[in-house]
Amino acid sequence: MDLSESLHDFILVFLGSGLILGSLGVVFFTNTIFSAFSLGLVLVCVSLFYILSNSHFVAASQLLIYVGAINVLIIFAVMFMNGSEYDQNFRVWTVGDGITLMVCTSIFISQINTILDTSWHGIIWTTRPNQILEQDLISTSQQIGIHLSTDFFLPFELISIILLVALIGAIFVARQ
């Protein structure tokens, strides 16, 4: 996207905030439905990051595969589960939880140190869409990606909608 630098930075901070809040919601919500919806927010924010960096095909794939299929399946699975199983076996803290907390905290601190120690001034964040020419592409998978995101985008989207409707219909029929 050809945006001014200040608008690009504002959108980047907004998406980062949505990503952080959504991931905190995934971890801290006690209701699994709310946690699954927070996961959907995280996946949509990641897809919008791809759009911001001019990777439209990857963004469309992210939306279709992860948000449109995986997250919907997670929500359906949570809806079909019996919630009383979890209430009976609830424990506050175990030794494994403490070890996991220490490992995750150390990984988080090391990632923060890596981010702060990295020089970000020489990195080119985006490419212009007109810089990619079809004859310059190395592999056929890149050519397929270009054609799916330009010439065949509408059929690709229609097939994904048909598959989603078929999945919802199969779950509805199986439930009855």
From Swiss-Prot:
A GO-annotated cellular component: chloroplast thylakoid membrane
Subcellular location: Plastid, Chloroplast thylakoid membrane
Keywords noted in UniProt: Chloroplast, Membrane, NAD, NADP, Plastid, Plastoquinone, Quinone, Thylakoid, Translocase, Transmembrane, Transmembrane helix, Transport
Its EC number(s): 7.1.1.-
Residue intervals passing through the bilayer: 10-30, 32-52, 63-83, 92-112, 152-172
Principal subcellular localization: plastid
Chemical reaction(s) catalysed: a plastoquinone + NADH + (n+1) H(+)(in) = a plastoquinol + NAD(+) + n H(+)(out); a plastoquinone + NADPH + (n+1) H(+)(in) = a plastoquinol + NADP(+) + n H(+)(out)
Group of enzyme by EC: translocase
GO molecular function, a single term: NADH dehydrogenase (ubiquinone) activity
Membrane topology: Multi-pass membrane protein
Keyword presence, Thylakoid: yes
Coiled coil: none
Subunit structure: NDH is composed of at least 16 different subunits, 5 of which are encoded in the nucleus.
Protein family: Belongs to the complex I subunit 6 family.
Function, as annotated: NDH shuttles electrons from NAD(P)H:plastoquinone, via FMN and iron-sulfur (Fe-S) centers, to quinones in the photosynthetic chain and possibly in a chloroplast respiratory chain. The immediate electron acceptor for the enzyme in this species is believed to be plastoquinone. Couples the redox reaction to proton translocation, and thus conserves the redox energy in a proton gradient.
Entry protein name: NAD(P)H-quinone oxidoreductase subunit 6, chloroplastic
Organism this protein belongs to: Phaseolus vulgaris
